[in-house]
Regions:
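Active-site diphosphate/adenylate-binding microenvironment
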Residues: 1-54
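Active-site-proximal loop->helix
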Residues: 88-93, 113-125, 144
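Short, solvent-exposed amphipathic alpha-helical segments in soluble enzyme
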Residues: 19, 46-48, 91-93, 119-120, ...
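Generic secondary-structure signature for well-ordered alpha-helical cores
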Residues: 7-10, 19-23, 67-70, 96-100, ...
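Short catalytic-loop micro-motif centered on adjacent basic/acidic residues
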Residues: 3, 76-78, 152-157
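General structural feature for long, well-ordered alpha-helical segments within catalytic domains
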Residues: 1, 6-13, 26, 87-90, ...
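Conserved thiamine diphosphate
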Residues: 120-170
C-alpha cells in the first residue's frame, strides 16, 4: 500500500464491525471494482464470498448476486475513481433502485494506481505531486446519495477507527 493509504484501515474497521455484530463470514459477500480498492475482497473475512468486478460495474454485479441470493450481507467497496467517474451511473442507479447493500467508497481524491491524477472528487485547488492545481469542482458523493434517497449515509476519516467502526456497524 502507498504511504498514508487508508484502505487497510477501512478493511480493519469492516472486520471489527462484523466481529462486534457477530456476523459469520460465510454470510458475507464482498465485491469491488478496479483500482486501489480492487483487492479488498481478498484482505478481509476469510471464508466469506468475494468477487472483483470490472471497472465501475461493482454495483451491477452486486445487484445480480443479491437477486440470486438474498440471504447474504452484501458489501461493496469501491474507490472514488471507480464510483465517481466510470461508475457514476452505477452508483446513482444502485441507490435509486434501493439495492440492499453496504456501499463503501474509499475516497482519496486521486487515482493512486495511475500515478496521481485527480479523481472527480478531488478538492478544487488541491495540488498534484507535480504542483498542478485541480481546476474542477468536486463531485459530492455524500450529497448525491442523500438526494437520491440512500437509507444510510456516513462519512469518516479512514484513520479514525473509533468513528469508522460505528458508522460501518450502522450501515450493516
Amino acid at each position: 500500500m502507498c504511504a498514508g493509504c487508508g484502505h487497510d484501515s477501512i478493511s480493519s474497521a469492516i472486520i471489527q464491525a462484523c466481529f462486534e455484530l457477530n456476523i459469520e463470514p460465510h454470510r458475507v459477500a464482498k465485491l469491488s471494482g478496479i483500482g486501489c480498492s480492487s483487492k479488498t475482497p481478498d484482505y478481509l473475512l476469510g471464508q466469506s464470498h468475494g468477487f472483483n468486478s470490472v471497472h465501475g460495474r461493482m454495483p451491477s454485479v452486486l445487484t445480480g448476486a443479491n437477486l440470486a441470493n438474498r440471504e447474504l450481507l452484501y458489501m461493496g467497496v469501491s474507490g472514488d475513481g471507480d464510483s465517481a467517474s466510470i461508475g457514476i451511473g452505477q452508483f446513482v442507479h444502485a441507490i435509486r433502485r434501493g439495492v440492499n447493500m453496504v456501499y463503501i467508497v474509499e475516497n482519496n481524491g486521486v487515482y493512486g494506481l495511475t500515478k496521481g491524477q485527480f479523481s472527480a472528487t478531488a478538492d478544487k485547488g488541491s495540488k498534484s505531486k507535480r504542483g498542478i492545481a485541480n481546476m474542477d469542482e468536486p463531485l459530492d458523493l455524500i450529497g448525491m446519495a442523500m438526494i437520491l434517497g440512500a437509507t444510510y449515509v456516513g462519512r469518516s476519516f479512514s484513520g479514525d477507527k473509533q468513528q469508522l467502526v460505528p458508522l460501518i456497524k450502522g450501515a450493516i
